[in-house]
């Protein structure tokens, strides 16, 4: 998973991030390039990630941009639920880690383990490989909070979950 610092101050202000070629481009163009390359992306964010008045569309947009996970210090309650409903896994930093303390630049590769047997509020290991090859091992709290949310994620979101269950019943 390639780190895309969509939640960084620069990107919020300027709406630009690094694309797969390392060059600065719009968030949309970078997201499409990563999707075309088959590379899932991660957003790193701060405290109360997702707070605001258009939370449902924020989660939909995140999913449509090909983002598979959001790693933040904390989540706004409804937005966290909306991310899960869209099939995007929310994770929270643990042990005082955050995007600033880890000195993230957007050139990192992220690998999150333990997702094949996910359970509510499970702590999972995450390996952040910096551009220079340095590896930072951190733990994340998976903010899938309930058993039904695990099922939503396993199906790719609540809509896929409902449609598959309707198809089974038919």
Language-model features, listed with the residues they occupy:
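Single conserved hydrophobic/aromatic residue that forms the stacking wall/gate
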Residues: 1-7, 12
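Glycine-rich oxoanion-binding loops at beta->alpha junctions
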Residues: 13-34
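Extracellular/luminal Protease-associated
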Residues: 32, 36-76
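Flexible loop/turn segments at secondary-structure boundaries
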Residues: 49-57, 77-81, 99-100, 135, ...
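Glycine-rich phosphate/pyrophosphate-binding loops
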Residues: 58, 65-97, 163-168
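Acidic, glycine-rich flexible loop/linker segments
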Residues: 80-152
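Extended hydrophobic packing segments that form well-structured cores
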Residues: 141-148, 155-167
């Amino acid at each position: 998973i390639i780190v895309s610092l969509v939640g960084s101050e620069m990107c919020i202000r300027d709406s630009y991030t690094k694309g797969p070629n390392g060059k600065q481009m719009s968030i949309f163009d970078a997201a499409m390039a990563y999707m075309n390359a088959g590379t899932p992306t991660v957003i790193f964010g701060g405290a109360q990630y997702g707070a605001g008045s258009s939370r449902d569309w924020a989660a939909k947009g995140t999913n449509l941009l090909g983002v598979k996970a959001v790693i933040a210090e904390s989540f706004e309650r409804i937005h966290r639920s909306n991310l899960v409903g869209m099939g995007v896994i929310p994770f929270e930093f643990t042990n005082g880690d955050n995007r600033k303390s880890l000195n993230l630049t957007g050139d990192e590769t992220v690998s999150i383990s333990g997702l094949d047997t996910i359970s509510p509020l499970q702590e999972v290991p995450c390996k952040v490989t910096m551009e220079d090859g340095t590896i930072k091992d951190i733990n994340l709290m998976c903010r899938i909070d309930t058993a039904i949310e695990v099922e939503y994620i396993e199906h790719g979101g609540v809509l896929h979950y409902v449609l598959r269950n309707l198809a089974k019943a038919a």
